[in-house]
Amino acid sequence: EGKKRAVKQKLRCMIIISYRIKVIIPETEMFLISVPEGGYVLHSMCGAKLDYVITYVDRENNFAVASRKIALEKMQKASNRRNISDRIIDADVVSVGRNVCLLNYGGYDVLLRQRDINYTMVSDIREIVHTGEVRKAKVKEFVPEEGILKLSIKETMPHPFDGVETRHPVGSTRV
């Protein structure tokens, strides 16, 4: 009674080696939103720029434990003061999968599907978007009280049918 025992538990985590120190971020401390299960998102985050807050330091074993959730909450409080509706912003690409991509702006993680990334159908989003990139995105909706941020990369690009009359005039032929 009253003694502390070590507990062994398997846990997915992100390991960042920064300044010769291992920083471990458990999966439970990574996201404020719900992301697909299975660790696929964590695996595709290699090369991403992540913000985190150190919550524990073990100097004896030369590692630290951190929380990305706390950092995201702090960033959200700061960005909630600004009105960014209908603006074009620079969003960080955090993770890219075959059908979905995770962007971060101002502490908000936003899942984008293929229809919000490109006008044309792409079988694999990883061909056009890469982890670690900074992409222009248009803010479609921003409700800070409810924690809603909706982005679109597609709306920052010109529509493929704009100017089609000059490129392909009526009566022209292509051989």
Question: Could you say what each language-model-derived stretch is?
Answer:
Residues 1-175:
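Single-stranded RNA-binding regions, centering on S1/OB-family and related RNA-binding modules
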